[in-house]
Structure formats: structure tokens, C-alpha cells
Amino acid sequence: MNVFVIGIGLIGGSLVKDIKSAFDNVTVYGIESNEANIAEALTLGIIDQKATYQDLQLADMVIVSIPVDVMGTELPSILDAVNEDCVVFDVGSTKALICKTLENHPKRRNFLACHPIAGTEFSGPSAAINNLFKDKTNIICEVELTAFKLQEKALKVFQAVGMRIRYMNPVAHDKHIAYVSHLSHISAFMLGKTVIE
């Protein structure tokens, strides 16, 4: 299986490490704008080869692990480059804008909108760890728009690395994630205000 990871940090790096552990005959190709990250990922054995978008035609699976603010511009180009049997999924923390951007793309059926809820405070290839996703929730949005055989391919990987799967629509996902991510800030603010009073 040819797995491409675009953005080799904590999430993308950890995911391909787990895929390599769970499956035989996996070759991981890395695409990254930061050459130092590519070199580090090669040295650490996270990826097997450096690649470019032109190589995406070889991919069986593409993991897009880049900042959400550039996903809208990059995902259409990524989908343009892949073959019909390749599943592309992102790991971004927001979904509505990404799903809206891709709704009329000719290869929308190749895309699966995902948000694995996992992480640490570290970043970069050296932050990648084994078993980051074990027993963690992966929220999938608009699953019905992805070709069934490609859903199956992705779900096989998610289950192999220990993820629990949940389904939501993109707007509800973003609303719930916004509430949860701001809850700690609100709690800290209110606690601080209480102490001051």
C-alpha cells in the first residue's frame, strides 16, 4: 500500500507510524514544505521517500495533515492529482468550510472528511509517537459522499490503529468542537474572576 502523508508533524507522522506497524508492505511517501521536516522524517523512519504532488498518482491513500487555513486551497489540487482508487482524508479540526469547498469537485467521492481527536503539546516529526490514536475518537463528516469502497479502505486503517468512529454533519461538528475547545478558557476565566472578587 502506497500511503502519502502531506504535512509530517505530530498527527500525520503518528498516523503513518501506526499504519506501518499495523500493515505489511506499506511504503510511506512524505510531502512537506519544510525541507528540515522531510530530512528529519526520513532519518526517523517515519517516511520512506520524499515526494511531490506529481507523485500522487501512485497513492492508494493520502493523509492531509496541514493547517486548516490552507486546506481549502490545497485539497482541490491534491484530489486533481490522485487516481480513481485512492482515498484522500484530512485530519483538520474544522470541517464545514472544507466540505463546502469540495462539494462540487469531480473527485469528491475520493475524499473523506475526518477529525481524529488526539494530540500532545509537541509538534514536528520528532513529536510523532506510536499508538497516539488508540481508543481516540475520529469524527467523520459527510461519509455518504465518499465512494463506499474508499470508505472501507479508510475504516480498515482507522480500526487497525485503534480509533473509535463517530459520524456528524460538518456544521454540527464545528459547533461542538468550538464549544469544547473554548470550555477550558471560559472555566479558567470564570475561576480567575471568582478569585479576584
Residue ranges, per PLM feature:
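NAD(P)+-binding Rossmann beta1-loop-alpha1 motif at the extreme N-terminus of oxidoreductases
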Residues: 1-53
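Hydrophobic/aromatic beta-strand patches that form the interior of the parallel beta-sheet core
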Residues: 29-31, 51, 89, 112, ...
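Short, well-ordered alpha-helix to beta-strand connector turns
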Residues: 47, 59, 85, 135-136, ...
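Rossmann-like NAD(P)-binding element
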Residues: 53-82, 86-89
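Rossmann-like NAD(P)(H) cofactor-binding subdomain of soluble oxidoreductases
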Residues: 77-126
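Internal alpha-helical scaffold of NAD(P)-dependent oxidoreductase catalytic cores
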Residues: 132-197
